[in-house]
Regions:
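Residue-level detector of well-ordered alpha-helical segments, enriched
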Residues: 37, 63, 86-89, 209
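Flexible phosphate/Mg2+-sensing switch loops adjacent to catalytic phosphate-binding sites
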Residues: 57-60, 101-132
Length: 275
């Protein structure tokens, strides 16, 4: 039976909706974008947005790149194979915008971050983007939930993981940059982001196909290393109930050795193996 690969271009408001329930598998690397990548993204958006007088729908669209998902056509659940850095950063940007636009816009932004639960019938909030287990609670509390950004900006210095520190640093960067804009400019940026910015969504229900696509569709973001691909292959093959355990072991060793040295280790292993 042939593997189905589906690719479609979608505006961002069609990404952060009920059609997708994104999850970052434990074998993925932690959030790694710094203010270099986040700053470039925001600068590009503002440059494309251009003249304040031009109607939003007449402004040239902006292509955000592609994301690769493991997703069945009849389900909203989508494991992110490639694109987590962009989706996480876009979520941070939306959260910061929510804190700086009028309430009627802020309420709409919340719908893009999570579907509100119902206390009467006992349903929980349904978050559009679910980070890896170790960062999930932090991300929900300080990014996705209302007033989270204010709490993050005032968060006293404490022990944060590298990925959590990157989340906080990028949120502070966006907050400072957006403060330099007028309120109408922030609203205009929000409208442009959701209506005129596009992602190509590549999805397949097949894990192997997703990883093959993953190796050739990393056009933006941090450069992948062979160890990233190997990690995805190895950890992805482990039963799901053990993936978090072995991901922690893998990342602990990578942190101890350093990313570049860890990469070199596999080159040496390969040379030994070939002998």
């Amino acid at each position: 039976m042939p593997v189905t690969i589906h690719a479609v271009e979608k505006a961002l408001f069609k990404i952060f909706n009920n059609d997708f329930l994104f999850a970052i598998p434990p074998y993925q690397r932690p959030y790694a974008w710094t203010t270099d990548q986040a700053g470039e993204l925001l600068s590009d958006l503002l440059a494309f947005l251009g003249d304040d007088a031009q109607p939003i729908d007449d402004v040239n669209p902006y292509f955000l790149g592609s994301i690769v998902l493991i997703k069945d056509a009849d389900s909203s659940k989508a494991d992110i194979v490639d694109g987590q850095q962009r989706l996480t950063t876009l979520t941070i940007l939306l959260a910061v915008l929510r804190a700086q636009v009028p309430s009627e816009y802020a309420q709409e932004i919340t719908k893009y971050l999570y579907e509100r639960g119902d206390v009467i019938i006992g349903t929980l909030n349904r978050y559009r983007l679910n980070l890896r287990e170790r960062d999930e609670k932090f991300f929900r509390e300080y990014i996705q939930d209302e007033n989270g950004i204010n709490g993050l900006l005032n968060l006293e210095k404490k022990q944060l993981s590298d990925s959590q520190q990157n989340i906080k640093t990028n949120a502070i960067y966006f907050n400072n940059a957006l403060t330099e804009l007028t309120e109408p400019q922030r609203v205009r940026l929000l409208q442009y982001l959701m209506r005129r910015c596009y992602l190509v969504v590549v999805s397949t229900p097949d894990l192997d196909s997703a990883f093959r696509i993953f190796t050739v569709l990393n056009a933006r973001g941090l450069d992948l290393k062979l160890s990233d691909l190997l990690k995805a292959e190895v950890i992805g093959a482990i039963p799901k109930n053990q993936q978090e355990k072995y991901t922690e072991i893998w990342e602990s060793e990578e942190e101890d050795l350093g990313r570049d040295t860890f990469q070199d280790l596999f080159a040496h292993i390969r040379m030994i193996y070939r002998k």
